[in-house]
Amino acid sequence: MRTLFRTTEFDAFYDSQPDKVKVKLGYAMKVVADIKVLNAKLVKKLVDSDFYELRVSVGNEYRVILFTIDKPNIVESEQILLLN
């Protein structure tokens, strides 16, 4: 449903995480890619911004900044850029 594009900064962040966090981030990215309407616990729009925040909790809270490339709304978007 959605195509996720990863920046080199995101890849560096992802590679530096422990395996448990990588598993949860991978699952969260799959949900973002496959599910049209996303739960606000997982993805939240940042106030007064074009960015969204992907949240994963594994002991600590890990956050990834998302940007919709093709549409202003994440529900309508088919292309998402993973920043960090």
Regions found by a protein language model. Name each.
Residues 30-59:
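A short, surface-exposed loop/turn module that caps and links secondary-structure elements
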Residues 60-84:
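Enriched for short, Lys/Arg-rich terminal
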